[in-house]
A protein has these predicted regions:
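Outer-membrane pore/translocation modules
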Residues: 124-241, 294, 302
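Outer membrane beta-barrel transmembrane domains
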Residues: 65, 71-88, 244-356
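Repeated loop/turn-to-beta-strand initiation elements of outer-membrane beta-barrel proteins
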Residues: 50, 116-119, 159, 168-171, ...
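Extracellular loop and loop/strand-boundary signature of outer-membrane beta-barrel proteins
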Residues: 39-40, 91-95, 142-149, 203-209, ...
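Residues that define the transmembrane beta-barrel architecture of outer-membrane proteins
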Residues: 48, 101-105, 143, 151-157, ...
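Transmembrane beta-barrel strands of outer-membrane/channel proteins
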Residues: 52-58, 121-125, 175-181, 234-238, ...
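Outer-membrane beta-barrel biogenesis signature
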Residues: 22-80, 162-164, 183-187, 210
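Residue-level signature of outer-membrane beta-barrel architecture
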Residues: 45, 56, 111, 123, ...
Length: 356
């Protein structure tokens, strides 16, 4: 009898020890438990858990393209100026964007009131800088000089609900429903060099503004599956303006597909394909009139395909077991932008996540 009880007790101890070890392994964040750092809202948190995230990104653009084909500055100067009827305006475009950078800081927080629902809030701050070249607006079209413009402000704030559709050991999916409010300025002004070789202070074009100040709705779905040692994910998001201002960015679709693999408990690598389709700007700001392509609301939107490679590392920077540092390099594969726009060059994303 005593031997049987001893065996039973030993079996229970082994079972409890194994369960505790399994629970500890479950609680320790594997790098691929969360998707590549460029994906937002990729998972639900456990009930009553918080997750804080910080993302830094830089996007670089250089050169120009017309309806998807690269063109030189001289080709840009032959394009008609839609504001030619305005007094003292040249007939053709006379200011040509050379390069642009956009730096973004995104701070987010997630909280799960239940295992089926996670709430996600995010604020974004961005800084934009652009270099441009000015040419004579009359005969000769000689080069006059270059100048830089910039804007920096809190851009937008959003609140999103993630609702679980299903979750099994190898498959999970959830829905997205989010609202975003543009809070940054949409009338930033800066000093420019005009085709008359004079400096003037003007309202910057749409792409240089911090936001369109619209209220937007985002709906979508995310699913992640485990296949052998790989995690495969897909995310589809649709974004549209609800409360429009004098001008708003067009509706857009974003589709992401990625594959991710762990290497040990601390490291994972990922590859991601991103497709974006966006309509042109709705409306117009009558104060934005200049002989430059970015002042024309028709020269926005289009279709782009990007390819990203990333790495995620489990970290204990602040002494926790639920920290991750991720990074991604994003390169354009295909750019079919609407009208005359700058060409995308590359993007880099660096992020940190911690679950509390």
């Amino acid at each position: 009898m005593f031997k049987n009880l001893a065996r039973l007790g030993l079996s229970l101890c082994v079972a409890i020890s194994a369960a505790s070890h399994a629970k500890a392994m479950e609680m320790q964040m594997m790098p691929s438990h969360h998707s590549p750092i460029g994906i937002m809202g990729d998972h639900l948190a456990m009930e009553d858990k918080w997750m804080i995230s910080v993302r830094l990104s830089r996007m670089a653009m250089k050169g120009n393209q017309l309806n998807g084909d690269s063109i030189l500055d001289q080709d840009v100067l032959q394009q008609s100026n839609p504001y030619a009827s305005v007094p003292n305006m040249p007939m053709e475009l006379s200011v040509v964007p050379q390069d642009m950078t956009m730096d973004m800081l995104m701070v987010g927080a997630m909280y799960a009131p239940s295992d089926a629902l996670t709430l996600m809030g995010m604020v974004m701050f961005n800084t934009k800088e652009m270099s441009l070249a000015t040419y004579n607006g009359m005969m000769g079209r000689s080069y006059l000089g270059s100048f830089d413009t910039s804007s920096s402000d809190l851009s937008q704030a959003s609140l999103t609900a993630l609702y679980k559709l299903y979750k099994t050991p190898k498959h999970r999916a959830h829905l997205h429903l989010g609202f975003t409010q543009g809070v940054g300025k949409n009338n930033v002004m800066d000093k420019v060099l005009t085709p008359m070789n004079m400096q003037a202070v003007m309202t910057l074009p749409y792409g240089m503004q911090s936001s369109d100040r619209s209220r937007r709705l985002t709906v979508g779905i995310t699913n992640v599956s485990t296949l052998g040692g790989y995690r495969l994910g897909n995310q589809l998001l649709f974004d549209t303006a609800l409360a429009k201002k004098s001008w708003t960015y067009g509706d857009q679709w974003n589709v992401n597909s990625w594959v991710q693999r762990d290497f040990g408990h601390d490291l994972s690598f990922s590859a991601r394909l991103h497709y974006k389709s966006q309509q042109s700007i709705n409306g117009r700001d009558v104060s934005i009139m200049a002989p430059v392509q970015t002042a024309n609301p028709d020269n926005y939107g289009g279709q782009v395909v990007d390819f990203a490679v990333g790495m995620s590392v489990a970290s204990n920077m602040f002494g926790g077991n639920h920290e991750k540092i991720g990074m991604e390099l994003v390169l354009p594969v295909k750019q079919n932008k609407r009208g005359l726009q700058m060409e995308s060059n590359w993007s880099f994303i660096l992020g940190y996540e911690i679950t509390l």
